[in-house]
């Protein structure tokens, strides 16, 4: 009996010993479902870079791994049975020699469960040696592998997880979708009583046409009145449109009234007649992000109609802008592109430009169009090179109020200038074409808002105002991805000192609603949280707000994003003080704040991380003391705060926008 018991004990001990020395299973990263990777460009490469080339980092080749493109993210369910993850990370050598790649940096990070950071590479650029990853995963259930862009160009961010491998005992690591979100409309319905919205500051040059529509919500019918209207201007009591011209420079304070059966709303409008226009950032629509080359007179008119029928006009949205592709293709014979007197001709999709602007103006809005300083536009259509005066006159004669001027083919002209004798400086070459068109626009008896589109070259924010720009693109083109939108928006810190009434940094158009850059549209790829971040951040940045979606297909969520008057008031505040970053934390949270004309602070609490996180703003960081009143601007309700700070939980890629005041 004792021998049998001893044998059983020995067998158990041997089994226990063998189990303790069992080798964990191994799973290469390439074996998980890589379709779950969300990345800004291309598809993940299996044992290849995102460009399909053998993986190489810092001159060292790797046989296996995953090639991706920042920004990218992969969620995994480890089930608590994983033990280790190892890899080598870095920027792939396949972007060597690309000028934009030289300025691009990426950062790899791995977080788990309660937003705990397990690995962070720090910024890496092409040519850097691969950095090893070796992390303990015992007890970890959810793992997120992230590659972020760190400044520089948004292109050529080829990032590799080389030789990535998990060890585990139990269930295999499984790639999963990122957590879903509900598209919750936070904006309360506008009250039935009258409320005047939009800008309270309007700039116009002496003797130039005035067109200002009182933006007001509330039940219709509604009538409008105004006190102290300047000589030369009249108000239509039915439409609320102020039109005419003011001869004498100066500042005029007009008292506006909007009345319906439930009451009257009053508000002051300051009209400044002088050299400055665009005294608060422009708000409107642009055709490119939804229609691109498919734009037409019919679609522009439909956008104007939708601006009215949706009620956006009642919240201060003003401009209806057609982008590229209204002209004749630049490869056509000269006589087909321009009339004998030099004025530019339109293609058959735009039969009558004057009739189109008249239509837009009749609805109380302003009209915009597009050109380039080079021989052809980005889309390959006729542009303004050597016809700047003729084109500016034509735009004014047609009745346009806005010009987007896109660098495009001028790069070819610039290269020829550089090769000539005694070439100007690089900065002078960048400035020259914008100065030429700026002078031409000033010669017109009409205010035409001048929007530079040259992607931030030469630090345009430092000189754009000096040569007549009302706004200037500060980065490359945006697209409807988190990496693009967040990479552009959160890179604006430091530019705030160059912005103000009449001259604004422009981080590009809004990518909410249905977009697509052509006839085939899709709902934005931004999640609901990301869209709230997008609008909140652009308003804090005093960015021009140009809707890029098909206005005829707006859903309630998109409409809610674009009609919150307390949020839009941050953007349209007459002080014109762009927000700056106040704090930036290792967990991906940031706080941005801007001064408001009433002495308050507009504050954005952002979470760029992959998991919910608490975000705090201290009154000391805002330069204020004592108890503060805090208002949630999206929900339009007051919230409680501590005596010296405010803290809230912000979801993945989300935002919480507040106003802090005494």
Question: Each PLM stretch: what is its role?
Answer:
Residues 641-662:
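C-terminal beta-strand-rich structural cap/linker in extracellular carbohydrate-active enzymes
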Residues 232-248:
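Strand-loop-strand motifs at the edges of beta-sheets in extracellular beta-sandwich domains
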Residues 390, 442-550, 571:
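Glycan-recognition surfaces
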Residues 532, 538-541, 546-548, 584-624:
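Carbohydrate-binding surface patches
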Residues 214, 250-262:
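A short beta-strand micro-motif common to beta-rich folds, especially ectodomain repeats
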Residues 24-187:
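Gly-Asp-aromatic-enriched flexible segments
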Residues 194-219:
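Solvent-exposed, low-complexity, repeat-rich "mucin-like" stalks and linkers
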Residues 289, 303, 307-422:
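Aromatic-lined carbohydrate-binding/catalytic grooves of carbohydrate-active enzymes
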């Amino acid at each position: 009996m004792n021998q049998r018991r001893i044998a059983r004990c020995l067998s158990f001990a041997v089994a226990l010993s063998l189990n303790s020395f069992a080798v964990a299973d191994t799973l290469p990263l390439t074996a998980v479902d890589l379709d779950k990777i969300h990345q800004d460009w291309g598809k993940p490469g299996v044992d290849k870079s995102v460009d399909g080339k053998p993986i190489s980092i810092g001159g060292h080749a790797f046989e296996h791994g995953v090639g991706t493109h920042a920004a990218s993210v992969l969620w995994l369910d480890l089930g608590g049975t994983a033990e280790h993850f190892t890899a080598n990370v870095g920027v792939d050598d396949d972007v060597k020699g690309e000028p934009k790649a030289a300025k691009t940096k990426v950062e790899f990070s791995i977080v788990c469960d309660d937003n705990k950071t397990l690995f962070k590479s720090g910024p890496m650029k092409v040519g850097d040696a691969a950095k090893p990853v070796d992390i303990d995963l015992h007890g970890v259930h959810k793992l997120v592998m992230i590659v972020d862009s760190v400044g520089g160009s948004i292109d050529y961010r080829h990032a590799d997880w080389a030789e990535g491998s998990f060890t585990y005992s139990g269930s295999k690591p499984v790639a999963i979708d990122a957590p879903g979100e509900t598209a919750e409309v936070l904006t309360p319905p506008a009250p039935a009583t009258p409320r005047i919205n939009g800008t309270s500051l309007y700039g116009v040059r002496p003797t130039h046409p005035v067109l200002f529509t009182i933006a007001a919500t509330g039940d219709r019918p509604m009538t409008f009145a105004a006190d102290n209207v300047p000589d030369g201007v009249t108000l239509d009591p039915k439409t609320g449109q102020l039109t005419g011209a003011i001869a004498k420079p100066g500042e005029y304070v007009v008292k506006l009234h909007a009345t319906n059966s439930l009451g009257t709303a009053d508000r002051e409008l300051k009209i400044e007649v002088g050299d400055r226009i665009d005294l608060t950032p422009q708000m409107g629509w642009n055709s490119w992000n939804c229609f691109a080359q498919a734009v037409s007179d019919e679609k522009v008119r439909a956008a104007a109609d939708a601006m009215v029928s949706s009620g956006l006009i009642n919240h201060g949205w003003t401009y209806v802008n057609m982008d590229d592709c209204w002209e004749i293709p630049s490869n056509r014979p000269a006589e087909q592109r321009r009339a004998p007197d030099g004025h530019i001709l339109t293609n058959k999709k735009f039969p009558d430009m004057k009739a189109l602007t008249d239509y837009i103006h009749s609805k109380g809005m302003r009209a915009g169009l597009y050109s380039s300083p080079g021989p052809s536009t980005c889309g390959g259509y006729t542009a303004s090179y050597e016809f700047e005066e003729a084109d500016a006159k034509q735009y004014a004669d047609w009745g346009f109020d806005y010009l987007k001027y896109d660098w495009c083919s001028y790069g070819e002209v610039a290269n020829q200038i550089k090769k000539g004798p005694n070439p100007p400086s690089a900065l002078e070459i960048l400035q020259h074409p914008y100065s030429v068109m700026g002078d031409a626009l000033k010669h017109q008896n009409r205010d035409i808002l001048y929007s530079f589109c040259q992607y931030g070259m030469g630090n345009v924010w430092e000189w754009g105002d000096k040569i007549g720009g009302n706004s200037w693109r500060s980065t490359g083109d945006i697209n409807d991805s988190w990496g693009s939108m967040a990479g552009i928006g959160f890179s604006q810190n430091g530019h705030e000192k160059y912005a103000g009434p009449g001259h604004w940094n422009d981080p590009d158009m809004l990518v909410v609603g249905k977009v697509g850059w052509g006839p085939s549209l899709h709902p934005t790829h931004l999640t609901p949280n990301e869209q709230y971040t997008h609008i909140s951040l652009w308003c804090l940045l005093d960015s021009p707000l140009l809707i890029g979606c098909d206005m005829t297909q707006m859903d309630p969520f998109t409409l809610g994003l674009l009609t919150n008057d307390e949020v839009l008031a941050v953007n349209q505040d007459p002080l014109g003080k762009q927000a700056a970053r106040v704090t930036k934390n290792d967990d991906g949270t940031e706080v941005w704040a801007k001064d408001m004309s009433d002495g308050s602070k507009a504050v954005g609490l952002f979470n760029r991380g992959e998991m919910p996180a608490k975000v705090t703003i201290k009154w000391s960081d805002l330069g204020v003391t004592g108890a503060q009143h805090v208002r949630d601007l999206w929900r339009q309700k007051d919230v409680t705060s501590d005596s010296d700070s405010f803290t809230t939980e912000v979801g993945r890629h989300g935002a919480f926008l507040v106003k802090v005041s005494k």
